[in-house]
């Protein structure tokens, strides 16, 4: 049952009656992984919508994915599962607050994790501060709202594009790992220009093991047979880079339901224990658990520096122009609103309540649309996404206006003068501000109404 390929020969005396090539059902040569572990990382890839409307997909992932996964964990203490974004956690707790303690317990056990970012965005479509807010409403939200819980692995498995500063943002947010896809399988240290990096893992394509290879759909013997070529393919890669012999298999695809592979895992490990040759073990793991095992001081990961331009060009421009404009406007207005709200609070000696709830709503609205614009019933999804971005922009504008008016009211200027603000963190060069007025031509007989007048102010200090 376990061994190498051979030729079976049937003889009668010296006469060969039959000869046939025979392959052992379970190969015995597992190379670098012979004493290692194969980790099943099971998740369900989730766009906010795409498969259908946001409301349909929200209900499906709560009732048909998250709840069944939690129920399996009640019966099997070795089962693990993960979602890819904190937004899914927020949705679930809103729908089922009675299971909050259970969610916290599974999180602490490391059996059900949710991802360290709010969702999975087009990184290149967001402003820098909008990318930072992915960690605010991801890892930071988890730490503030689920006592004793934390997450250090960000997911963005669908979009084939990485932004230059994203590793820097993640690293400085305490997020050590990045789980991506749609690039060559392997383990990487992905660097930003400032020298910060995150450990990055890609399985190749997030859905291949589920859709094509189907390692675990039958029994352990079939799993041994189908996984053996992976050990031959990756032994030299792991050995040469001194990466511990842990190999990951991602079982995921769009909206896939949880599957308990315990029968295959148990049978596999019984065979490995009884075998007279060294065979790898099989277990359920989360991405964070797996990456902690391979991230050793001796490991020499491939290094990647800089950006990977997004290949899905159709989504960034004409197809969703209005949404893109609103998102970019919100990305400018909201940081300025936060800045001058804080300045105003200082001017008032802290007596003005900081409108955190309004800012939270605005920021989450500005990053709510993920990478799943369009799709089935896409006209509904796009309208919802567009409304969300418009809310973010309009809230940003109103919050900024409120703070600027309060500050301007305290400036001792004569009536009719203009107060000009600089929201940048560096000196601003002479700035032109156009304001409506009436002007006359050289001849008094001709009047040009509402001609813009340029008001110039030089040496504008930062944040002033």
Where are the predicted features?
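Catalytic-domain carbohydrate-binding cleft regions of carbohydrate-active enzymes
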Residues: 2-423, 443, 449-455, 459-463
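Surface-exposed beta-strand/loop patches in extracellular or lumenal glycoproteins
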Residues: 421-438
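Solvent-exposed beta-hairpin/edge-strand motifs
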Residues: 435-447
């Amino acid at each position: 049952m376990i061994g190498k390929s051979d030729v079976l020969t049937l003889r009668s005396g010296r006469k060969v009656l039959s000869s046939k090539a025979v392959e052992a059902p379970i190969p015995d040569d597992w190379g670098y992984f012979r004493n290692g572990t194969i980790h099943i990382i099971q998740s369900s890839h989730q766009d906010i919508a795409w498969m259908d409307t946001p409301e349909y997909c929200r209900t499906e992932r709560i009732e048909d994915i998250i709840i069944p996964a939690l129920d399996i964990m009640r019966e099997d203490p070795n089962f693990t599962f993960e979602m890819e974004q904190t937004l899914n956690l927020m949705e679930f707790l809103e729908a089922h607050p009675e299971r909050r303690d259970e969610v916290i317990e599974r999180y602490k056990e490391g059996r059900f994790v949710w991802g360290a970012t709010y969702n999975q965005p087009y990184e290149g479509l967001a402003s820098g501060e909008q990318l930072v807010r992915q960690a605010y409403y991801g890892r930071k939200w988890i730490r503030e709202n689920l006592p004793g819980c934390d997450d250090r692995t960000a997911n963005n498995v669908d979009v084939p594009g990485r932004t230059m500063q994203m590793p820097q943002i993640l690293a400085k947010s305490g997020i050590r790992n990045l789980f991506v896809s749609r690039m060559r399988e392997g383990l990487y240290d992905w660097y930003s220009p400032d020298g910060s990096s995150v450990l990055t893992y890609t399985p190749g394509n997030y859905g291949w093991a589920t859709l094509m290879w189907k390692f675990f759909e039958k029994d352990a013997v079939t799993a041994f047979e189908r996984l053996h070529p992976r050990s031959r393919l990756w032994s030299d890669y792991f050995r040469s880079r001194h990466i511990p012999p842990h190999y990951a298999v991602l079982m995921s695809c769009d909206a896939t339901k949880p599957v308990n592979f315990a029968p295959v895992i148990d049978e596999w490990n019984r065979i490995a224990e009884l075998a007279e040759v060294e065979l790898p073990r099989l277990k359920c793991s989360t991405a964070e658990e797996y990456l902690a095992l391979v991230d050793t001081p001796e490991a020499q990961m491939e290094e990647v520096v800089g950006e990977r331009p997004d290949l899905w060009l159709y989504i960034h421009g004409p197809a969703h122009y209005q949404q893109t404009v609103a998102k970019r406007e919100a990305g400018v207005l909201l940081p300025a609103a936060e800045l001058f709200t804080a300045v105003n609070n200082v001017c008032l000696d802290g007596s003005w309540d900081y409108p955190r709830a309004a800012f939270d709503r605005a920021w989450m609205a500005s990053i709510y649309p993920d990478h799943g614009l369009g799709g089935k019933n896409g006209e509904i999804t796009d309208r919802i996404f567009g409304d969300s971005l418009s809310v973010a922009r309009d809230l940003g504008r109103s919050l900024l206006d409120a703070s600027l008016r309060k500050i301007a009211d305290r400036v001792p200027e004569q009536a009719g003068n203009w107060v000009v603000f600089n929201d940048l963190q560096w000196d601003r060069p002479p700035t032109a501000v156009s304001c409506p007025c009436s002007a006359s031509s050289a001849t008094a007989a001709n009047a040009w109404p509402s001609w813009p007048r340029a008001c110039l102010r030089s040496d504008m200090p930062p944040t002033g």
